[in-house]
A protein has these predicted regions:
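Short amphipathic alpha-helical elements of helix-turn-helix/winged-helix folds
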Residues: 39, 56-61, 74
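Short helix-capping/hinge SLiMs at alpha-helix to coil transitions
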Residues: 45, 60-64, 78
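DNA-recognition alpha helix
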Residues: 67-79
């Protein structure tokens, strides 16, 4: 990113499906199990039973934001035999592979976003919920000067909202 230019933030891709780290999207069939297998393989990850089950829970419902604890609870209800540590490890592997985007709200809460396109978020404080900002034309007018030897890897904007009193 050239810091002297304005940075335009684009919206979701057409169907909200995660894009592999290589920048290519696997062909989708509409079968979540097959699609998860294709996404994992395209990202260079072996489709283990646990990755497949967690991937199906993550990506089978479209674009969404989950914490590790939320996914673990879903897995437990779906009778997927995984530990919380396995959920954390899998989420980090999927993030490293470019299939998820990690969004830290504060020092204690991290969400994993299945929409890896460049976009920003509202954080609903009362509900502890992360929501995509729907404006695909949101633009940051001026970027800060970057210290020598560094480059901007990503810009995250989280607008915190609370109900009016």
């Amino acid at each position: 990113v050239d810091v002297s230019d304005n940075v335009a933030i684009s919206g979701d891709d057409a169907d909200g499906v995660a894009v592999a780290a290589a920048g290519r999207q696997p062909a989708l069939t509409g079968c979540p199990w097959h699609d998860v297998n294709e996404m994992l393989q395209a990202a260079g990850l072996r489709p283990t039973r646990q990755r497949m089950a967690l991937g199906w829970l993550l990506f089978g419902k479209g674009a969404r934001h989950l914490t590790a604890e939320m996914l673990y609870e879903e897995a437990t209800h779906a009778k997927v035999p995984v530990s919380l540590a396995t959920v954390y490890n899998t989420l980090n592997q999927l993030t490293d592979a470019g299939l998820l985007r990690q969004v830290s709200v504060d020092g204690t809460k991290t969400y994993f976003d299945t929409n890896v396109s460049a976009h920003h978020h509202f954080y609903l404080e009362g509900n502890h919920e992360l929501v995509d900002i729907p404006d695909p034309h949101l633009v940051l007018q001026k970027m800060p000067e970057v210290p020598e030897g560094y480059e901007i890897s990503r810009v995250d904007m989280i607008v915190r909202l609370r109900k009016k009193r």
